[in-house]
């Protein structure tokens, strides 16, 4: 137990010592490189010469910035050199006598960016160079400067001159190992263990080693394609499956234990393939089990009656999986690596300078001239890798790709893209402008059509619609027009075109005036022969039509008169007796003559009964009769009209029926009024 305690105490002590040493080493170094010291006369600052010569050494004091440098404490550090030479001499990079050039002034704090520097040259009469061992007048020269200084690898050259001496030197500030940043305050130590896998960049940031990622490069990058949820890895390019999953990329579920011919979508399932059944899909149902057509361990699935599908194992193809595939056919090896097919995959044999599963990582350095097309190589991470700075028009990790700045088709509206070294330009089609031909230019904007022509902007130019009297591409040509084409003159006037003004002039005939001869002058009115002619013609036409109508009527009246008629004589005596009363008789047929026969009793016929024949209601001839005799008491002679005889045996004549010949063109109608003492005989067509 005591031994264990002592061992633990020892380790703790060693750790403290290491930490103290690390802190004492500081975070940076101020370096001063002496180059040349000139003391041609070999004298001291007091002007007294050195005997036999000035054996010169230097004391350097570095301190914080002061506007006026004082000889106080050297807060940033101090250093002395051995004797470097006599009088005038040049200082080598590493002087003899155990001195170091450049001189190192380490500091263990954040570099402030400003400083004050004192450089003293002393004469050493003996070998003891301690300040207390030297007389005060042994000083040869003293210079003091102050300024700002950034951390960097570049040296700043300076030269200080006094009355008797001249000193040329250079200086810089660099960070100590494992310190980075603008003020050497960032600590970074590369490592490749459980706590991280990285190197340090020039700014102190971590740069993960290939295959690692994360804030401190502790997370491995799994095999490409490894399922994010179903797989994991403990080292790069590895893919370990979680429970229930299998396969190279852990994307295949593990079916239920004992599942023979089934699949799964989640772990521990057993979904039978077609043609198999049972709890574990081990019962053969059809063609696949009976005939086993699939080769090389392929899975057979029934897809119908006597049909099947073979699911081949990796590395096989064909209908029955009878053909073997090589995984090297896809050329997985990069950078010229050769592929070797293996039973469970493939292996890439990488050429010199490359490594990795697919030879994707390069081990080249700038010494191998890896940059093409004039690219410059720059080493990174202390030569662990490199970066190529490509010239214009080239890109890629090794400047192997030529940049085509027209690939993105930047020119619009059909413009042509042209490469012009580090830039590009667009050649626009007519009608477009702009850096990328994005602006449409209207050819009509400048009003190119003359004399009031109308401009039409076309895709590849413009077109002018010219007004009357102008032609040409821009309506610039004046042309004469036929002003008389529209016949503007009236009343048979003669039209002339005025070529100077492109207008018309009307030469009017006698009797008309006006710009178009549209106004008549005061002349005696002429006889209206046209109206008279039309009236006379119309009258003649009406007369002819009347004559034609009369002729047609006469032709219709010339039928035979001996036709059979139904006369009043066909009536019975009683009917005759009551046919004609002693009232007025109206005969509407002017062609017929009325005769009343009173029969045997003539007494009534001798009476004055005023049987009057009234022809007023007869508009025209209605029929033709052949009955002889006249009515004795007629007020109007019937002339040559054919008689219509009416016979009656009684003194009263009562007419109650129609009597007329049925086959004649006219009908004699006996019209009986409401009063019995009135009898009307009429004809009706």
Curated annotation (Swiss-Prot):
Example GO molecular function: receptor ligand activity
Keyword Magnesium attributed: no
A Pfam entry, by short name: EGF
Cysteine disulfide links: 50-54, 61-74, 175-184, 188-200, 208-217, 222-233, 226-239, 241-250, 253-264, 259-270, 272-281, 288-300, 294-310, 312-321, 328-339, 333-348, 350-359, 366-377, 371-388, 390-399, 406-417, 411-426, 428-437, 444-455, 449-464, 466-475, 484-495, 489-506, 508-517
Site entry (Interaction with Notch1), positions: 110, 216
Glycosylated residues in this chain: 108, 183, 205, 393
Region annotated Interaction with Notch1, chain positions: 185-187, 191-195
Protein's UniProt keywords contain Disulfide bond: yes
Compartment annotation: Cell membrane
Keywords: Angiogenesis, Cell membrane, Developmental protein, Differentiation, Disease variant, Disulfide bond, EGF-like domain, Glycoprotein, Membrane, Neurogenesis, Notch signaling pathway, Repeat, Sensory transduction, Signal, Transmembrane, Transmembrane helix, Vision
EGF-like domain ranges (all copies): 218-251, 252-282, 284-322, 324-360, 362-400, 402-438, 440-476, 480-518
Tissue: Expressed in vascular endothelium.
Lineage: superkingdom: Eukaryota
Record-annotated membrane-spanning stretches: 530-550
Domain free text: The Delta-Serrate-Lag2 (DSL) domain is required for binding to the Notch receptor.
Function, as annotated: Involved in the Notch signaling pathway as Notch ligand. Activates NOTCH1 and NOTCH4. Involved in angiogenesis; negatively regulates endothelial cell proliferation and migration and angiogenic sprouting. Essential for retinal progenitor proliferation. Required for suppressing rod fates in late retinal progenitors as well as for proper generation of other retinal cell types. During spinal cord neurogenesis, inhibits V2a interneuron fate.
Protein name (Swiss-Prot/TrEMBL): Delta-like protein 4
Organism this protein belongs to: Homo sapiens
Gene: DLL4
């Amino acid at each position: 137990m005591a031994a264990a305690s002592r061992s633990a105490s020892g380790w703790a002590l060693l750790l403290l010592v290491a930490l103290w040493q690390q802190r004492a080493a500081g975070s940076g170094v101020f370096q001063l490189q002496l180059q040349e010291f000139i003391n041609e006369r070999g004298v001291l600052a007091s002007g007294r010469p050195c005997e036999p010569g000035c054996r010169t050494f230097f004391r350097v004091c570095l301190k914080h910035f002061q506007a006026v440098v004082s000889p106080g404490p050297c807060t940033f550090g101090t250093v002395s050199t051995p004797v470097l030479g006599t009088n005038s001499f040049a200082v080598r990079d590493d002087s003899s006598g155990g001195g170091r050039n450049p001189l190192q002034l380490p500091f263990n704090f954040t570099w402030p960016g400003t400083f004050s520097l004192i450089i003293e040259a002393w004469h050493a009469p003996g070998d003891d160079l301690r300040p207390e061992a030297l007389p005060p007048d042994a000083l040869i020269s003293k210079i003091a400067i102050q300024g700002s200084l950034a951390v960097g690898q570049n040296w700043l050259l300076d030269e200080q001159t006094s009355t008797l001496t001249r000193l040329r030197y250079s200086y810089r500030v660099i960070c100590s190992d494992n310190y980075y940043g603008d003020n050497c305050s960032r600590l970074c130590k590369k490592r490749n263990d459980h706590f991280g896998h990285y190197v340090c960049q020039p700014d102190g940031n971590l740069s993960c080693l290939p295959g690692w990622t994360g804030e401190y490069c502790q997370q491995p990058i799994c095999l490409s394609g490894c399922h994010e949820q179903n797989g994991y890895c403990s080292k790069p390019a590895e893919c370990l499956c979680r429970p229930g999953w299998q396969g190279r990329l852990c994307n295949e579920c593990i079916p239920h234990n004992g599942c023979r011919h089934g699949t799964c979508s989640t772990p521990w399932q057993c979904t039978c393939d077609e043609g198999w059944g049972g709890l574990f899909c081990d019962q053969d149902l059809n063609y696949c089990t009976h005939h086993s057509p699939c080769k090389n361990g392929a899975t057979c699935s029934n897809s119908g009656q006597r049909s099947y599908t073979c699911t081949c194992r990796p590395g096989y193809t064909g209908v029955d999986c009878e053909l073997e595939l090589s995984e090297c056919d896809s050329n997985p090896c990069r950078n010229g690596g050769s592929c070797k097919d293996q039973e469970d995959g493939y292996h890439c044999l990488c050429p010199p300078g490359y490594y990795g599963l697919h030879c994707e990582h390069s081990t080249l350095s700038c010494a191998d001239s890896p940059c093409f097309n004039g690219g410059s190589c720059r080493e990174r991470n202390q030569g662990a890798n490199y970066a190529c700075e490509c010239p214009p028009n080239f890109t890629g990790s090794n400047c192997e790709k030529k940049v085509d700045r027209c690939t993105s088709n930047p020119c619009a509206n059909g413009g042509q893209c042209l490469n012009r070294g580090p830039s590009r330009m667009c050649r626009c089609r007519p009608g477009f402008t702009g850096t990328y031909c994005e602006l449409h230019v209207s050819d009509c904007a400048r009003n190119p059509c003359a004399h009031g022509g109308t401009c039409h902007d076309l895709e590849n130019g413009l077109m002018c619609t010219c007004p009357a009297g102008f032609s040409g591409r821009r309506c610039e040509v004046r042309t004469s027009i036929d002003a008389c084409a529209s016949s503007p003159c009236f009343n048979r006037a003669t039209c002339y075109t005025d070529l100077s003004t492109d207008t018309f002039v009307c030469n009017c005939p006698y009797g008309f005036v006006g710009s178009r001869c549209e106004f008549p002058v005061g002349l005696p009115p002429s006889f209206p022969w046209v109206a008279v002619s039309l009236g006379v013609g119309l009258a003649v036409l009406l007369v002819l039509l009347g004559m034609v109508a009369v002729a047609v009527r006469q032709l219709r009246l010339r039928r035979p008169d001996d036709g059979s008629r139904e006369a009043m004589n066909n009536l019975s005596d009683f009917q005759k007796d009551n046919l004609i009363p002693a009232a007025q008789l109206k005969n509407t047929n002017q062609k017929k003559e009325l005769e009343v026969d009173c029969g045997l009793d003539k007494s009534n016929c001798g009476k004055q009964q005023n049987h009057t024949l009234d022809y007023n209601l007869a508009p025209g001839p209605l029929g033709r009769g052949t009955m002889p005799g006249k009515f004795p008491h007629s007020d109007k002679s019937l002339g040559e009209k054919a008689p219509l005889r009416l016979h009656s045996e009684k003194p009263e004549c009562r007419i109650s029926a129609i009597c007329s010949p049925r086959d004649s063109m006219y009908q004699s109608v006996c019209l009986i009024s409401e009063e019995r003492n009135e009898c009307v005989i009429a004809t009706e067509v």
